[in-house]
Structure formats: C-alpha cells, structure tokens
Amino acid sequence: MNKTAICGLRAALVIVFLLILLALGALILVGNYFYTFALDPNAKGGFGSAAGIVDSEYTRWLLKDSRDVSLISDDGLELHAYRVDGSVPHRYAVLCHGYQNNATGMASYGKHLFDLGYTVLLPDARGHGESEGDYIGMGWPERRDVVRWCQQLIAEDPAAEIVLYGVSMGAATVMMASGEADLPVQVRCVIEDCGYTSVWDEFSGQLKELFGLPPFPVLNAADLVCRIRAGYSITEASALRQVERSVTPTLFIHGEEDTFVPFWMLEELYQAASCEKEKLVVPGAAHAESAAVAPELYWPAVDAFLARHMA
C-alpha cells in the first residue's frame, strides 16, 4: 500500500471515529434532555401532573388534622409524610400519590379510609412535596421507601395491619413494593388504581404520543443517564415483574378511557399477578378519575375488598 493510500485510510478512520464520537455525544445529549424533561422534579416540562380530580375540601382536612412525620430512606434522604390517626386500633393505610404531584393529591382517598377508622399515612414521594430528592423514581426507588414506611409503622405497633394504596405512579409504587422479599407480612393487601406495567412501557407510549418517536435510541440513552444521575435503571423498573412475585392480595383498578396510562396495561398486570386478585374497570373514566367519575361503583368495590382482607 503506497503512502497516499495509507494517508487516505487514516483520514477515513479519523472521520469515522469523529462521527462515532458525535453520534455518542448526540445520544448523551438526547438522553440527558429526556431525563431532565421526565425525571427532574424541578425542571419545567414533564408529562404533566397525574393528579386526577383534586378536591380542595379534602386537602384542607388533611392539612388541618394531620401531623408531620419523617423517615430517613435507605440512601439517606429525609422523607416527609402526613399522618392522621384513626379510630380503629392497628389498622393503617399507606397512600401513594402520582407523578409530579404530592401527598395532598391523595387526601380524598385518605379521608375515605380515615372515615372507616384507618390511621392514614400519606407520604410525599422522593423529589416531591416536602421530601428530599432531586429526581423522580417512577416508583422504583420509592418501592423501598414504602417498605421502610411500613417497617416504621410496625416498629411503633407490632400488631399493625396495613393496606398499600396508590394512584398512577403511586399505583406502580405499591405494585413494585408488593414484590419485595422483605415486605412485612403485616401488609395485608394492595389497591392499585391506574398503574403502569413498567416505566419503559409508559415512557415508550409518551414518546410516541408527544414526539412521534420510537423508544430506540432515546430511552436507551436516557436509561444510561438515569443510571448515572439517579442510580437506577429504567429497564428494571417493572411493576409487571413485581406482581409476578407478589403474594399479597391486590385489587387492580383502571378507567376505561385512560390514555395516559393506557387501559390495556390493566389486563397485562392482572394476568401477570400470581397473588389473590380482583379487578375493577370503571367505564367513562380517564386517568386517575375513576373515584370521581363513578364513586357509586368505585368505593363499594374498595370497601368490600378491604373488608375481605383487613381484620
């Protein structure tokens, strides 16, 4: 090979190398942008709050009648929750809120259970409300926080019986917690309302809906950034896999008109669950609106489920 050919080959290799670097750099930028857009609680943007229909009357009740409690997470964050003590001894509900919301978003659910005698605990998820944290975990790191909240309740009251109750991201959180090997046996049942199968599935759907993009390569790049910045992987954050492991009776609820967390996810979750299970479909309800749209259907189903599984 003559000198000219060698120089040409070197130039071509340099160009290819630079193009690869540019492509990798572009992927990192895209991944970082998506991470900031979707998982940074302080950034403007995101997919919008999954608060459903919020009633200020219940928020006022919660803020007036509750006391503040705190917990240090496994990774050192100070987490906040509202607690309202109920009339029935040893009966507790841990209620988990949705994406870009806070504990007050679960006030109406908390009031219903409080009226049944439950002591209700409404945590602010990490990165939300008054809890520390600089990222949204979409339920995966929060599942460990839920286990810790349960352990704290049991340390105070070894005879505690607990229901985990979540809406939207909170529903994914309690499903993910239900598959943990160290979930206390005092957790008697789980109620999930419009939770997603996995973070990957949910983000894939939102990418297509909002930007017309496929998951590859955006989510792959975002997953790498998430591992670096938040310490968890989007690919491992699966409620579907966790309910396969769960032995805790679970009520699956979904609004038939939900497009934010698509209605088809209900059946996949329900079929995957290996625990004792029930299902409630709410006609006409969009995302996180089932209780408000059809209270005459919703609350009797919830109450009957609780009556079967809480002493």
Describe every region a protein language model picked out.
Residues E256-V261, A288-E289:
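Acidic catalytic loop of the alpha/beta-hydrolase fold
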Residues A285-W299:
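Catalytic histidine-centered segment of alpha/beta-hydrolase-like enzymes
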Residues G110-E132:
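Conserved alpha/beta-hydrolase
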Residues V16-I72:
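An N-terminal hydrophobic leader/cap segment in hydrolases
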Residues M176-S233, R241:
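Hydrolase active-site cap/lid region
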Residues G105, I136-D157:
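Alpha/beta-hydrolase active-site loop
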Residues A239, T248, P262-Q271:
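Short alpha-helix in the alpha/beta-hydrolase fold that links the catalytic acid
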Residues R245-V247, F252-H254, D258:
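Short beta-strand/loop motif that positions the catalytic acidic residue
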